[in-house]
Amino acid sequence: MQTHEIRKRFLDHFVKAGHTEVPSASVILDDPNLLFVNAGMVQFVPFFLGQRTPPYQRATSIQKCIRTPDIDEVGITTRHNTFFQMAGNFSFGDYFKKGAIEFAWTLLTNPVDQGGYGFDPEKLWATVYLDDDEAIQLWQEVAGLPLERIQRRGMADNYWSMGIPGPCGPSSEIYVDRGPEYGIEGGPEANEDRYIEIWNLVFMQNERGEGTGKSDFEILGPLPRKNIDTGMGIERVACLLQGVDNVYETDLLRPVIDAVAARAPRGYGRGSHSDDVRYRIIADHSRTAAILIGDGVSPGNDGRGYVLRRLLRRVIRSAKLLGIDDAVVGDLMATVRDAMGPSYPELVTDFDRIQRIAVAEETAFNRTLSSGSRLFEEAAQSTKAAGADRLSGRDAFTLHDTYGFPIELTLEMAAEADLAVDEEGFRSLMAEQRQRAKADAAARKQAHTDLTAYRELVDAHPTQFTGFDELTTEARILGIFVDGRRVPVVGHDTATAQHRIELVLDRSPFYAESGGQIADEGTITGTGASQTAKAAVSDVQKIAKTLWVHRVTVESGEFVEGDTVTAAVDPRWRHGATQGHSGTHMVHAALRQVLGPNAVQAGSLNRPGYLRFDFNWQGALTDDQRTQIEEVTNEAVEADFEVHSFTTELEKAKSMGAMALFGEAYPDEVRVVEIGGPFSLELCGGTHVRSSAQIGPVTILGESSVGSGVRRVEAYVGLDSFRHLAKERALMAGLASSLKVPSEEVPARVAGLVERLKAAEKELDRMRLANARAAAVNAVAGAERVGKVRLVAQRMAGGMSAGDLRTLVGDIRGKLGGDPAVVALIAEGDNDTVPFVVAVNPAAQDLGLRANELVKQFGAAVNGRGGGKADLAQGSGKGAAGIDAALAALRAEIDRS
């Protein structure tokens, strides 16, 4: 199925279901928080927040989206793309979870000849937010999805937000099983290469506040009304329906690759991975560049313009590395137009401008390449004249920084000149540049608008950290900031709770948040004439790795820049933090003992009494592995290992076997933390206990997935661990008392009760269905005549599900013969729900009756809604009081037909 057909079917499906088709917004919106539109719902945010009244209750669109954080990964893997199309359906206070699930399931599983995509229902899985029992029930009832193909996942996976303040809520994702040739079974939780996500249903019900990451943010409260936002990836669906492994093989990007291959001396897919990467970069970036130019972006040196410039220059550079020396961008824009024009007519109508801008950038960059090449030749000649065989890192950096030369291009040109490149020196200079940029970014994060004054503090007055040796330090105030502005004085009388107040000190015992360890808490108090001044420290951040910024609340007196103060860490807080950090090292060591050296750290968080450790690992841990990890850790606690730290050279630390976080940049001199000699040895700048016994018991709470190939272990330490165990013990004692068995027999007793309950429920269902079928026989005999139609419209016994009703409707319809007939059954369900099913046989359809139309009349009387096909439709409502009215409304509707 071609991509344009996939798009058409999506829009047609939802337009038929009462949605208004809304054109894609530009990828550029007037939003300071958003560089590019990166989700289908962005243009509807004011509606979701209740800031504007939508002109429709249901909408559908296919949105152009751009994401560039992983631009360097494009081409290297086949999963990353800078441009993608997000098909979505949206409800603004209209339908909610049930409707979203039903619409998605119908489109995915309906046969191709009925307007669907024809996915095999047996190949579909769903994930839901771990607390969303309602979604699990709906997947079973609406889609018939068995419980074994529904998986619960945590906030990082199934609680959606845009990553910035705005709407948020639990989500449910639909996955397609590609089969055993793509990996192990077990659903998305086990293998996201085999199980591919194609659709995300977001049940938008809250607004999120400030925060970082996928789960570290505040949920502010409910939205004015519940909304639905879904997103189906057009490219991923195209891959599956076209039977290819990745988007580069679809009708969207393969034409671009073929156009390049027709001009390059080396073809695509001929065994050279580096060449294939270049082909994919050209295909992806050409498409994104065309979309950006079409939406009004021009190449520039900052913001969106810089992204476009970088994309085009990567295209040009990749083409040259493939051996294409002449101009190529103009032809690539034409190929993109031909492939994407049917979906985005602006690429056709505005093609001349798009091509002109792209070609102008190519011409300019070719001049840059020419100038840079001359600089390279001069540097190469100077290097050889000096008797060296390696181009300096400074020369490579200048080529990169001044002329935009990627290091890969410099490396290739150097190899052609029989020279190596000082990559380490280049990376060091790049790191310095990034550090300067990070200092600015960190300053902005701290809301410092006076960046010049802030840089002065960074350069002239680095903070001396004293917290390894003492918890109380005499210090001088270097700077005071209120809401990001530097001020000379701040006092209790002038600073309210709404103000963000920060003190910068020349010396500090407070640990600043880093390395997974959260910041210390404590107090800063005045001395001498300012002895009445007191502030509570709630957070400490490090700027440019040299300056400690203390977030405070002024409780009394006033602080003046230059004053001498006493900075004191809360000893209980520090002790808890050291327990968590040392516990993290020990859990890491235990993981590697049990799982082997491939269990490498991917991240961590430790705070008083708690630790969280992420590590690279494929698949969930077994119960035995979790038990072993916990046992090894606690054996090390009991061994009372000595914990000590020392400073040494980086290379020496590595030769000793010290563990380092992959991808982290370390200085030449590093701090090493050793626990029990060979048990644990890691590079670390955090605070730790003096002996392993001070950690106290370590209790592993659980293990989960936080992404493809990354697992997470969470644990309590110290008193928090004891309290958790005491709570578990009390819970077990209560269960044992209720079940009247010893504690060790509780699991077996509970398992037995569960089996008995399942058997009883199964027997109850069988009896209820048998009674209902007996009633159905009587219903056939008592069918009433309404006009030309035989009608069976009955209120069934309570407790029947929609599935039970469908079974009975089928039985009754089969017994009514070939005369025009309509069957409508309604029952009182759980929690005052009212499920109903309507069936219309072919003869009645010939009279103009449609089940999906009748079910609307039926549902209106019970405050519900439904949908389906002409022969069979179903729905549900609220309130059994309306059942008789629903049956009467149905009779009246049939009588009118």
From Swiss-Prot:
Keywords: Aminoacyl-tRNA synthetase, ATP-binding, Cytoplasm, Ligase, Metal-binding, Nucleotide-binding, Protein biosynthesis, RNA-binding, tRNA-binding, Zinc. Its EC number is 6.1.1.7. One of its GO terms (cellular component) is cytosol. It catalyses: tRNA(Ala) + L-alanine + ATP = L-alanyl-tRNA(Ala) + AMP + diphosphate. The keyword tRNA-binding applies. CDD domains: AlaRS_core (cd00673). This is Alanine--tRNA ligase. The lineage of its organism: Bacteria, Bacillati, Actinomycetota, Actinomycetes, Mycobacteriales.
